[in-house]
Amino acid sequence: MAGAGPAPGLPGAGGPVVPGPGAGIPGKSGEERLKEMEAEMALFEQEVLGAPVPGIPTAVPAVPTVPTVPTVEAMQVPAAPVIRPIIATNTYQQVQQTLEARAAAAATVVPPMVGGPPFVGPVGFGPGDRSHLDSPEAREAMFLRRAAVAPQRAPILRPAFVPHVLQRADSALSSAAAGPRPMALRPPHQALVGPPLPGPPGPPMMLPPMARAPGPPLGSMAALRPPLEEPAAPRELGLGLGLGLKEKEEAVVAAAAGLEEASAAVAVGAGGAPAGPAVIGPSLPLALAMPLPEPEPLPLPLEVVRGLLPPLRIPELLSLRPRPRPPRPEPPPGLMALEVPEPLGEDKKKGKPEKLKRCIRTAAGSSWEDPSLLEWDADDFRIFCGDLGNEVNDDILARAFSRFPSFLKAKVIRDKRTGKTKGYGFVSFKDPSDYVRAMREMNGKYVGSRPIKLRKSMWKDRNLDVVRKKQKEKKKLGLR
């Protein structure tokens, strides 16, 4: 076995080399691989720069090969050296700057909800070259290209009808975009200077089309107001004249200067240079901006006319005007004048005697007046209590019936001359249910030393009006 030569089928043996399975188709040569790499580089640069690069051949569609198992001889054959294309020195920097610029532009613009444009391949791109897009470089280039595409913004919808007052807003858009405008100042009105109006609106924020509310384009507030006339300056009484009115403009000029400084400070804070001098424009309605008629001159005190006192305004002058007082009657000589206070309106009303209600009673053909009935409630439920002892008074009778919730009053009738009890009294209730319970439970109970007898009170039947009404009814019926 030691003198045996190499086995047949190995390199160096005299026998033929037995090819392995699938070795009938040769592998890719170095030129084919070089062409594939050049095609991949050209595709990458076209994806990044968006145009074919001159001097580099386009990609050649590769022939799909069947994967083979390399043999030992094929593995030992040295491969041809691969020649890579030379890239210019500034190519990487130019591509990097382009990518950074497009990424910055894409970061400031919010892409719309609509999908991006479809992908279009380079010239000469065939279906067989789609396998080259699976590489990480191609995917990154495709992602950067899609991010760098500027999104399409939806057009701004304008209303079909715009009032003539708002049509001037379109002309003011150019001035609004150029820089900040001076704020419109509120004119002084009746010696009052209002605060400055809010500054002009800044540039619109980068929002998607659906984020802003629909409406007319933004414009200046001053362009929306019609031009009005300047209102009259505030007037103040002069020092030396005293009988006329004099215009005073120093306060108005000082207020306007202060407002101009405030508007300039706001304009500088907003980022723009301060514009020209502020223009005072009327911001009040036409009815309020019209000049008011001059008031009539009022008679002034002598001190103001002579210049001893400072000038006064109209409200102060009205308070200083003497009010006419009624002349006091002078008392006769030798007597002192005494001030008698006049009675007030309430005292006059109280002094009038109110019409008292008279309670006229009638029974057994006689009539009399009983003012004690005014102490009782006219809408109560009253019980007559008879057979009372001499020791029973109002407190004892009230203590006996006070256990009922709606108990109002109890009274024992006495003789006016002697003060002795007449042997009966009355108890009043507000609730009819308590009235019925008292009639049922307290009848025959001892109050003092005697049992009392209860019955319904007939006090209403003895009123003169009720008696006459009943008599008329009886006459109509023919009973009497």
UniProtKB/Swiss-Prot annotation:
- Key words, A-Z: Acetylation, Cytoplasm, Methylation, Nucleus, Phosphoprotein, RNA-binding
**SMART domains, per database record:** RRM (SM00360)
One Gene Ontology cellular component annotation held by this UniProt entry: nucleus
Per the record, residues carrying Phosphoserine are: S135
Q: Which residues form the RRM domain?
A: 381-459
Where is the protein found, in the record's own terms?
Nucleus; Cytoplasm
The record's region (Necessary for interaction with HNRNPK) falls at 236-480
Per the entry, what this protein does is: Binds (via the RRM domain) to the 3'-untranslated region (UTR) of CDKN1A mRNA.
Q: What is this protein called?
A: RNA-binding protein 42
